[in-house]
Amino acid sequence: MRQKTLDVLEFDKIKSLVANETISDLGLEKVNQMMPATNFETVVFQMEETDEIAQIYNKHRLPSLSGLSKVSAFIHRADIGGVLNVSELNLIKRLIQVQNQFKTFYNQLVEEDEGVKYPILDDKMNQLPVLTDLFQQINETCDTYDLYDNASYELQGIRSKISSTNQRIRQNLDRIVKSQANQKKLSDAIVTVRNERNVIPVKAEYRQDFNGIVHDQSASGQTLYIEPSSVVEMNNQISRLRHDEAIEKERILTQLTGYVAADKDALLVAEQVMGQLDFLIAKARCSRSIKGTKPIFKEERTVYLPKAYHPLLNRETVVANTIEFMEDIETVIITGPNTGGKTVTLKTLGLIIVMAQSGLLIPTLDGSQLSVFKNVYCDIGDEQSIEQSLSTFSSHMTNIVEILKNADKHSLVLFDELGAGTDPSEGAALAMSILDHVRKIGSLVMATTHYPELKAYSYNREGVMNASVEFDVDTLSPTYKLLMGVPGRSNAFDISKKLGLSLNIINKAKTMIGTDEKEINEMIESLERNYKRVETQRLELDRLVKEAEQVHDDLSKQYQQFQNYEKSLIEDAKEKANQKIKAATKEADDIIKDLRQLREQKGADVKEHELIDKKKRLDDHYEAKSIKQNVQKQKYDKIVAGDEVKVLSYGQKGEVLEIVNDEEAIVQMGIIKMKLPIEDLEKKQKEKVKPTKMVTRQNRQTIKTELDLRGYRYEDALIELDQYLDQAVLSNYEQVYIIHGKGTGALQKGVQQHLKKHKSVSDFRGGMPSEGGFGVTVATLK
């Protein structure tokens, strides 16, 4: 895109806004290189890239990029054998630290909100290399200013010697300066440094009292800085140690530089990605400051900018206007008063397109649509050149000639006051001819003019639409509102009347203008009134639609709350009912258990299937808490006699003996034969019958509720206890009595320890006097 166009549209000021938001020289470099793209895919990618980071920036607090700096020069120097200093290594360390912090932040962000995807940013995060080892090597070796003492064993030893020698020098010099005899001979009782040597300030007249080397003197010459002979050798030793220290530091820095060179490619990738992120975040910050939104780019030629405003004007006072090239409209001609905002409208359109194609969000409401232009051509403002001795008209015409040579169907052309600066009739004719030529080329055109002839131009051409900037006759000032589809009209008579000009003069003037022009002005006035009425109705309609949407949202939320409340009430009712049924079921289980025991002990006539059926009636009253709890039988092939089935209501397996009819079947469940609904049966796959082995066993007799272990040996007693507890559990006993006698207490202790570990025992206690006292332990079974 032409630099001249960017200059006229003041794109450099937009770049300055973005540059002010960058953190690093990397981001600033990207801003300086920022130019509008002209390839459709590139433009879309750049906008998506900015929008992704803007979404994150508007919702979250981004990690700091402070300290990020360009390090590629250091990396290249390391690669060719140079040695980096501590400051340069720290900048590389900070690059790694910043990229790690941002990657951690992004990973946490994605984990917290899995539904949101950032494909472009995700790709950038995947590009960031792992440089943990290099970071640790630098971090453990030096701080911001110098190498750590423990950077190497040799460096630690050298610095330790320097420290101890310095301490001895200080002690020696302290004795001299604190000596009572020397107080009057010293300018000050301090130890200072000159030429990297420890010295004391001696008055010039007492020079002969101090043996040593004079390293410096005061400006007045009254103070000499003397290194006493007693510390000369120690200072020499420090100089040698400093030299050794420098050699060791050089060795360590060379080693660290080698590590940097080994990771040069990864570091350059990290620098490139983080620089781009700084650039994108700066775009996001700038976009938020102008309340920018993301436009939709279309392949077909489109311009729709709802409530667009110029981003360089004061946001509080600027008037936002909708700029739109409606379907089949290729040329828009704006008429209206001077200083009414026509030129600002042109610049707003041109600058927004340049911004959008540079990957910047644009100052419009949501829903803007744009196509991608290969070039934007402008003839805006007074570009008169004094040096070239060109008039205003000549200057504009020179620019227009160049535009007409280069413009094509992929161009946007902006003409400000087309044909101005010459005879009105000739200027209007030239303007119409130029517009016809540009329309023939196929460019999209927006032009401003004050020629009345151009108001009728759109009515004689297809694809041309009039527009105007509104003028308030009451306040005698422009409103800066753009009226699409309405041509501007002359307000001279109204303004003159407002200013107090005689009505006789005004009326006579009206008779002097042509009938056609008068009718045109009346038509335009009518159009303006209709436009305002329609615009008012549209605004009212928009308000009503928003209110309706709000009411709809409120009602939807209330309905959802009602449904949740209703569901909660039903669930609570089911829960309470289930609790009551559960209590009744437990009571029934206890009764059935007692009846079984009674049958086993006394042979009572109790029918098993009657007990199960009674309990099933309680189970039928259970309410499922959720769909997942509703058991639905699986549909298999048709059930026939001989099939193995599961009886869903009892949870038991059985065999179908006979199909009574389409709805019922006779099923054998163990020793019970029942007629059941077929829908209560679930067909099972027959298991392969394994050959059975005949095992003879004795009939199990009913066991007692007590076990007498008296007379048993310790080990035998515990074996007998285990067997007894198993039988007691099978007999559904809740409590049994273990008789172990008193004796030495060893058997009692062993029994109780065994009961404590047994899986079927929930509790035990010593016997009451009526139960046998200490000779008995009472165990409660699970």
Swiss-Prot record:
<dbReference type="GO" id="GO:0043023">
    <property type="term" value="F:ribosomal large subunit binding"/>
</dbReference>
<keyword id="KW-0378">Hydrolase</keyword>
<dbReference type="InterPro" id="IPR007696">
    <property type="entry name" value="DNA_mismatch_repair_MutS_core"/>
</dbReference>
<dbReference type="GO" id="GO:0140664">
    <property type="term" value="F:ATP-dependent DNA damage sensor activity"/>
</dbReference>
<dbReference type="InterPro" id="IPR036063">
    <property type="entry name" value="Smr_dom_sf"/>
</dbReference>
<dbReference type="InterPro" id="IPR046893">
    <property type="entry name" value="MSSS"/>
</dbReference>
<dbReference type="InterPro" id="IPR027417">
    <property type="entry name" value="P-loop_NTPase"/>
</dbReference>
<dbReference type="GO" id="GO:0004519">
    <property type="term" value="F:endonuclease activity"/>
</dbReference>
<dbReference type="Pfam" id="PF00488">
    <property type="entry name" value="MutS_V"/>
</dbReference>
<comment type="similarity">
    <text>Belongs to the DNA mismatch repair MutS family. MutS2 subfamily.</text>
</comment>
<dbReference type="GO" id="GO:0072344">
    <property type="term" value="P:rescue of stalled ribosome"/>
</dbReference>
<protein>
    <recommendedName>
        <fullName>Endonuclease MutS2</fullName>
        <ecNumber>3.1.-.-</ecNumber>
        <ecNumber>3.6.4.-</ecNumber>
    </recommendedName>
</protein>
<dbReference type="Pfam" id="PF01713">
    <property type="entry name" value="Smr"/>
</dbReference>
<dbReference type="GO" id="GO:0006298">
    <property type="term" value="P:mismatch repair"/>
</dbReference>
<keyword id="KW-0694">RNA-binding</keyword>
<dbReference type="Pfam" id="PF20297">
    <property type="entry name" value="MSSS"/>
</dbReference>
<dbReference type="GO" id="GO:0019843">
    <property type="term" value="F:rRNA binding"/>
</dbReference>
<keyword id="KW-0547">Nucleotide-binding</keyword>
<comment type="subunit">
    <text>Homodimer. Binds to stalled ribosomes, contacting rRNA.</text>
</comment>
<dbReference type="GO" id="GO:0045910">
    <property type="term" value="P:negative regulation of DNA recombination"/>
</dbReference>
<dbReference type="InterPro" id="IPR045076">
    <property type="entry name" value="MutS"/>
</dbReference>
<dbReference type="InterPro" id="IPR005747">
    <property type="entry name" value="MutS2"/>
</dbReference>
<keyword id="KW-0699">rRNA-binding</keyword>
<dbReference type="InterPro" id="IPR000432">
    <property type="entry name" value="DNA_mismatch_repair_MutS_C"/>
</dbReference>
<keyword id="KW-0238">DNA-binding</keyword>
<keyword id="KW-0067">ATP-binding</keyword>
<dbReference type="InterPro" id="IPR036187">
    <property type="entry name" value="DNA_mismatch_repair_MutS_sf"/>
</dbReference>
<dbReference type="InterPro" id="IPR002625">
    <property type="entry name" value="Smr_dom"/>
</dbReference>
<keyword id="KW-0255">Endonuclease</keyword>
<dbReference type="GO" id="GO:0016887">
    <property type="term" value="F:ATP hydrolysis activity"/>
</dbReference>
<dbReference type="GO" id="GO:0030983">
    <property type="term" value="F:mismatched DNA binding"/>
</dbReference>
<comment type="function">
    <text>Endonuclease that is involved in the suppression of homologous recombination and thus may have a key role in the control of bacterial genetic diversity.</text>
</comment>
<keyword id="KW-0540">Nuclease</keyword>
<feature type="domain" description="Smr">
    <location>
        <begin position="707"/>
        <end position="782"/>
    </location>
</feature>
<comment type="function">
    <text>Acts as a ribosome collision sensor, splitting the ribosome into its 2 subunits. Detects stalled/collided 70S ribosomes which it binds and splits by an ATP-hydrolysis driven conformational change. Acts upstream of the ribosome quality control system (RQC), a ribosome-associated complex that mediates the extraction of incompletely synthesized nascent chains from stalled ribosomes and their subsequent degradation. Probably generates substrates for RQC.</text>
</comment>
<feature type="binding site">
    <location>
        <begin position="336"/>
        <end position="343"/>
    </location>
    <ligand>
        <name>ATP</name>
    </ligand>
</feature>
<dbReference type="GO" id="GO:0005524">
    <property type="term" value="F:ATP binding"/>
</dbReference>
